[in-house]
């Protein structure tokens, strides 16, 4: 379908599906015995295109740049039209080869789920893991800026009043959904950020008393049930479950219509970097659009960067639940020796002011 759409200019085309069944037994000295079975399905296609030999290469993926996975069977794959998706991304990849580069400067930004689930729901939330806040976990981009301000949990302003972030290990189809974690704690749903205020962390039986000691009071009453191990031969680590950025009340089309001239809309993620304390970041995307004279025009090689606290405090809102999307990341890495784990991430399009925007490779 990709070759039919743009011919030989779609010179590199890939696709794949993944299906897993995992059965997990857990027993502890308190008398708990659990037997859980998980079915995971996922698929992704991608294309690289160029105008001619030696020219600029642009790539697109479908449905998302970091995989498309859920706790479901083949019906999950059937729900998306991959043939139509292949034609769309082949056409977009070639269009990007002819498109202007992204603008440079401070602009309003709309960030779509294909990018924001990685930035807002994944890379940022690594900093909410209890072990990183204690300084006992530093692999793969370090600790957390919260480790320096732990006594301020419950009062510290993380973002604007529009920001609500939940850890939920019970949502249907989430790849981070289960009945019990690998310490035997039951699944839970709780806020990490409530109305912009930092109120929670991803905790465990191991980290909870240590965090309370650092906080200076008994803030956490029970484990957050976030401990998971890659296999029976690995030590459980504090892990993201399904991280859900709650939808707002804005109609997505109305959000786009009301955005000022020069606003940039960011699509699927393709690159990321974040500092040792999860504070300063830079993210690049496969595809972007700039609002010019009321129309959304294609832009390539777009990135945005900044300070996570200033960024989240500049949030103007989120689209409503009609635009909310749940993704499953199949390969979140953590630990030494490294372990891979599936984590779920949900968001609707997010709207921000005063975002630093630039060009990848410039």
Placement of each model-derived feature along the sequence:
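N-terminal small-residue-enriched
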Residues: 1-362
């Amino acid at each position: 379908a990709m070759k039919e759409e743009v011919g030989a200019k779609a010179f590199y085309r890939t696709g794949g599906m993944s299906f897993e069944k995992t059965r997990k037994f857990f027993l502890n000295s308190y008398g708990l015995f659990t037997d859980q079975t998980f079915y995971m399905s996922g698929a992704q296609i991608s294309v690289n295109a160029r105008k001619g030999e030696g020219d600029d290469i642009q790539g697109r993926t479908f449905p998302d740049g970091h995989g498309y996975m859920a706790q479901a069977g083949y019906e999950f794959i059937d729900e998306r039209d991959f043939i139509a998706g292949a034609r769309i991304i082949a056409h977009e990849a070639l269009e990007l080869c002819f498109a202007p580069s992204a603008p440079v400067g401070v602009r309003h930004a709309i960030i779509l789920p294909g990018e924001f689930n990685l930035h807002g729901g994944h890379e940022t939330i690594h900093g909410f893991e209890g072990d990183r806040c204690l300084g006992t976990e530093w692999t793969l981009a370090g600790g957390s800026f919260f480790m320096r301000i732990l006594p301020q949990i419950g009062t510290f302003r993380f973002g604007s009043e529009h920001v609500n972030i939940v850890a939920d290990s019970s949502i249907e189809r989430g790849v981070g959904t289960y009945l019990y974690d690998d310490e035997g704690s039951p699944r839970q749903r709780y806020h990490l950020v409530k109305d912009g205020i930092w109120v929670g962390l991803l905790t465990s039986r191991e980290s909870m008393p240590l965090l309370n000691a650092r906080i200076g009071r008994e803030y956490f009453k029970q484990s957050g049930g976030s401990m998971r191990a890659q296999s029976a031969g690995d030590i459980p680590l504090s892990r993201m479950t399904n991280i859900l950025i709650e939808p707002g009340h804005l109609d997505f089309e109305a959000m786009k219509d009301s955005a000022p001239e020069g606003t940039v809309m960011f699509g699927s993620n393709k690159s990321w970097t974040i500092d040792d304390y999860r504070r300063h970041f830079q993210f690049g995307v496969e595809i972007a659009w700039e609002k010019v004279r009321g129309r959304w025009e294609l832009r390539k090689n777009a990135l945005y960067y900044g300070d996570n606290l200033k960024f989240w405090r500049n949030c103007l809102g989120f689209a409503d639940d009609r635009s909310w999307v749940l993704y499953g990341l199949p390969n979140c890495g953590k630990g030494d020796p490294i372990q891979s784990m599936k984590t779920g991430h949900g968001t609707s399009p997010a709207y921000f002011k005063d975002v630093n925007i630039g060009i990848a490779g410039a």
